[in-house]
Amino acid sequence: MSKAPVVFAIVVVLFFVELNAGGLPKSFLEALKMAKGDKVAESFIYKNRNDCMTNCKLLPTCPRLAPECCPTKTPECPK
């Protein structure tokens, strides 16, 4: 059995993870570090980030979770 497909799949996954992590704001990544691998906390952080993009008044931490959208929307804020 060839190992090439397995190696290719690993490279694709690593590239995808690196691409996504590079696009996230530093303050959001710091919030994830504070969760320290707690899957429930991480899911809340991601959900709150998505919700903050459309409603900055949802949480007092919205400017940290989605700084490209709160308090003012920039062109980088997803529509």
Swiss-Prot record:
Q: Give a short account of its post-translational modification.
A: Contains 3 disulfide bonds.
Asked if Transmembrane is a keyword of the record, the answer is no
Q: What is its main location?
A: secreted
**Name used for this protein in its record:** U-scoloptoxin(10)-Cw2a
Task: List the subcellular locations.
Answer: Secreted
Keyword Cell inner membrane present in the record's keywords: the answer is no
User: What is one term from the GO cellular component aspect held by the record?
Assistant: extracellular region
Q: Which UniProt keywords apply?
A: Disulfide bond, Secreted, Signal, Toxin
Question: Molecular function (GO) terms listed?
Answer: toxin activity
Family (UniProt): Belongs to the scoloptoxin-10 family.
Annotated signal sequence range: 1-21
Q: What is known about the tissue distribution of this protein?
A: Expressed by the venom gland.
